[in-house]
Structures are given as C-alpha cells and as structure tokens.
C-alpha cells in the first residue's frame, strides 16, 4: 500500500476575521473547520514580495503555483527590475551599457520605447526614469522618448500625470525629450493588426502623423476630440521650425522597457527583422545594431535581452521524479495549466513517473451559474486513484473559490466554498485511510472578500493570508511561512533531500 502525500490547493481560499462579504467565513465548512482544529496549522503570506511581486500587490494563480512548485521566491519581471534598481545592479547591466557605449562612440541617439504608466502589468514608468538617470550619469546627450499611452491598466485619462512626472525627471537629469506619442491601441497591438503598428513606425522613423509642440498639447487635443489615452493617434513632437524633435536613424540604439512580451513583440519585430514583410516599411529601414528588450520577448525578435529568463531547475516535480516516486497532477480545465505548466516552473513536458488527469470544466457562460463546477468529477477521479495505490505524491487544485469568487456574488461563492469543503473531506479521508498525509493550503485569496465596504461586488484577488494545515499530529509548524516554503515542507514529509536551488525553508519545526 502506498502512503500518499497530497498537496491540496484550495484556489482563492483566503482567511480573514471580518465576516462581512466573506464567503469563506459565512459558508458551512465542517471538514475544513475540523482539520483546522484537529491538526497542526498556520497561515502563509501569498502576496507581495513574498511571492516575487511588488510589495502590497495581490497574488494570482500563475505566480502562486510557480512559487509553490519551485520551493523558492520566483521574482516576476517587475519585481526583478525593481530589485535591480534598488540594489544598484540596473546601472551595471551589460546590455544597457553596450547600448550606451555604442551611441557615445557613434555620436548617435538613444531611443526609449515603452508604456508610460505605473500600471505594472506591461511596464513601469520608474524603469524609464532609471534609464534616463543612467543615460545622464553616462553622459549620453541625445535621448528620445517614444511614449506609449496606457489608459487600460490605469485610468483612461491619466496620461498628463505621467507626462508631468517624466518632465520632472527630464528637468532633474537634464536628459531626454519626447519624440513621439501613441496610444497602446496602435503601438502595442498583439493581434496582427499591422496597420496600427505601421502608423507608429511611420511616426517614429519618418516623422509622419499629427504634429504637436509638446506631449501635453498632443494629449489635450486628443481629449478635446473625445480620444483618450489608449487610442491617441501616433503623433510627432516637433521643434519651433516644425521639424521632428527626433526620428529613428541608422546606428541609433533602442531600449524597449516593457517587460511583458505579448504586446511588445510586433513593434519590436518591425525594427529587428531584416526580412519583415507584414507591411512595407518604405525606403528608410534604420539599421539598429543595439536594440535592447527588457526581457526575452520572442524568438522572432532579434534584440539583446537585459533581464534574461531564469531557468527554474529542481522544482518539486523534478525532485520527486528523480527520487523515483510516482506523482499525479489533477485539476479541472480552468486550473490544469497551473498544476502542470506553472507548477513545473514553466515546463510543458511531464517528468518521468508523472501522470496527469484533466477533468473538463462545465460549459457555462459564468461559473456563478454552476458554483460546483466539475469538483465532484475531479474528486471521484482522485479518490479512485488513491484507492488504487498508484501515486506517492498528489498535486490537486480545487478551482471553485477562485473562479466563482471572481463573480463578486455572495450566494454562488458561498455555494462554491461549501462544495469545496464537501470534496475536501472526501479526498482527505481517502488519504488518511491509506495512512497518508495531506497538506491543505491555497495559492491566494479571493472568496474571502466578495463585497467592497459600500456593498459593490469585489471581483479581484485579495492580499489576505492563506491556510496551511498538515494532517499529521506529531509535527510542529513555525509561523511566518510563504508559498515558497511548501515544497521544502513536502520534501521533509517525504524524507527526500531538499536541493540547493530550493531556497524556501520547511515549515515543520
């Protein structure tokens, strides 16, 4: 008989004392409550820098499963760059230094592309400010900003504030000028609407498009015409004599400071692909020997990468596999990539000895219409596997508290919590019957806050702590744990040595 060690992830199941708007607290959950009272338990931090996100930022399922599976803090691109700036490594970055050295030797210009906002989804304006300060420190004279306006990850009419903030840094450093302005609708298309990208290219390279004396004027004119940040037409900033402040020319350098690839790829390809055929670039195709991307955008972009991908070696799945143990990953469609691809550190392929079970999520318009989703089918499939003694390690995700929690509706979310509790009981009892151990936890909160203080639906994740229960009476747990400590704890329970790459610490004292 195998004694399975199971990790049960109750997706979106956070903890907070206030019961108002709290579906987790209001639901009847006798199984969870019993395990919480009977077995060693603590809470874990699942948001902010503890999971590699900026301080105070709510966690999410991708980040949560990455951290849990990796057994370490996995810094997301935004935080990675922030930490590099804070610790002084940003200015030493070899890729940035090469671009700066190039323009100084050639007497050419440095162009900064990117989304001008602090939304933190695709870019952060602080990273552009760090580049302006670096250029000033290194004595680069010609620095031009090609600002992509946001209006999507931030308010629809916030561009002026970001322009003001940029002008303050330009004044502080004595470096930088706005050269073009374009809404992200044009500059950051990802759906092959190349006519949009072409308008940007022609503004940046040929100085074609509406012209303005400064960035502020461009935004004000757009607003007057009912066009807000995201949709501002690619426009050119001109000097007193109506010539463009700057166009992009041979031997210039570009630093594209967006860190999220999907909406950066198309415009980067226009500048880096010699055989680009999506539209006619015209007679002027500037040769840019130093085109720097903040992160790895795509194999189709021929640029240098400032922050190269971090390979996650020796994740929990890999270590368990190398120890010769059999593992099962099981979830319904909505969370299947999380227990497989993300849990394995961004790896698609199965490890030796790994089996996967995918249960289809129900086909409904929104999950508040079916709060139980496919949890009963997932549970039946898993209990059958446990009874057949097939696996040493089980990774299970119950999706309901998160997927229904996103509705911001109390009644369906309470039902989702109650269905989750019912199935949690079935799975844990099957594991205990085999003399196994379950770890019950979550990747982030959601169902714990369904209403704002004024009664409006709250559809986002929360920053509340998540539960951590080990169904084994003879262990003691420490406080202050994070998601990256879960894999080392599982290895402790399995009696498998923790690899050096896993920098998390076991929660078992």
Swiss-Prot record:
Q: Is Iron there in the keyword field?
A: no
Q: What is its EC number?
A: 5.4.2.12
Q: Which residues bind Mn(2+) 1?
A: 402, 406, 461
Q: Give the GO terms filed under biological process for this record.
A: glucose catabolic process; glycolytic process; sporulation resulting in formation of a cellular spore
Which Pfam families has this protein been placed in?
iPGM_N (PF06415), Metalloenzyme (PF01676)
Cofactor dependence is on: Mn(2+)
Binding positions (substrate): 122, 152-153, 184, 190, 260-263, 335
Record keywords, A-Z: Glycolysis, Isomerase, Manganese, Metal-binding, Phosphoprotein, Sporulation
Residue numbers carrying Phosphotyrosine = 35
Functional description taken from the UniProt entry: Essential for rapid growth and for sporulation. Catalyzes the interconversion of 2-phosphoglycerate and 3-phosphoglycerate.
The name this protein goes by in its record: 2,3-bisphosphoglycerate-independent phosphoglycerate mutase
Q: Which organism is it from?
A: Bacillus cytotoxicus (strain DSM 22905 / CIP 110041 / 391-98 / NVH 391-98)
